[in-house]
Amino acid sequence: MLQPKRRKYRKEQKGRNTGIATRGNAVSFGEFGLKAMGRGRLTARQIESARRAMTRHIKRGGRIWIRIFPDKPISKKPAEVRMGNGKGNPEYYVAEIQPGKMLYEMDGVGEELAREAFRLAAAKLPIATSFVVRQVGT
């Protein structure tokens, strides 16, 4: 599962996920990409689940790049604990996703195979996505 090896601080404030992705919004490594159209949070488990779905579909061919990393800790209080007494412990990590962010990239496979693999991966994710092809000259 993806998570940071070390952090300066264990806990982080909630913050607001606004705006659109100005960085990491183009196909940079592969030939095809899965781009976020919606906004939200992807947990490390969701990222891994989508990766597995893609990897199983393309079998031994091709290469996959994961362009996002879950670096924000989400804390949670235990069940049946009264309010107060400080913030809960970090439970899992998420990646904050803005519209336009490239989530995954793929190369070394045909367009039909890539499209189907990304469709299977998108079914595992809680945000709207779209299939993109690298533009000529980029």
Curated annotation (Swiss-Prot):
Disordered: annotated span: 1-20
Keyword Repeat included in the entry's annotation: no
Gene3D superfamilies: Ribosomal protein L10e/L16
Keyword annotations from UniProtKB, A to Z: Ribonucleoprotein, Ribosomal protein, RNA-binding, rRNA-binding, tRNA-binding
InterPro entries: Ribosomal_uL16, Ribosomal_uL16_bact-type, Ribosomal_uL16_CS, Ribosomal_uL16_dom, Ribosomal_uL16_sf
Biased composition (Basic residues): 1-13
Any single GO CC term annotated in Swiss-Prot or TrEMBL for this entry: cytosolic large ribosomal subunit
Coiled coil (residue ranges): none
This protein's record includes keyword tRNA-binding: yes
GO MF terms, alphabetically ordered: rRNA binding; structural constituent of ribosome; tRNA binding
GO biological process, one term: translation
Stored HAMAP family: Ribosomal_uL16
Entry similarity comment: Belongs to the universal ribosomal protein uL16 family.
Quaternary organization: Part of the 50S ribosomal subunit.
NCBIfam families, alphabetized: rplP_bact
Function recorded in the entry: Binds 23S rRNA and is also seen to make contacts with the A and possibly P site tRNAs.
Protein name as catalogued: Large ribosomal subunit protein uL16
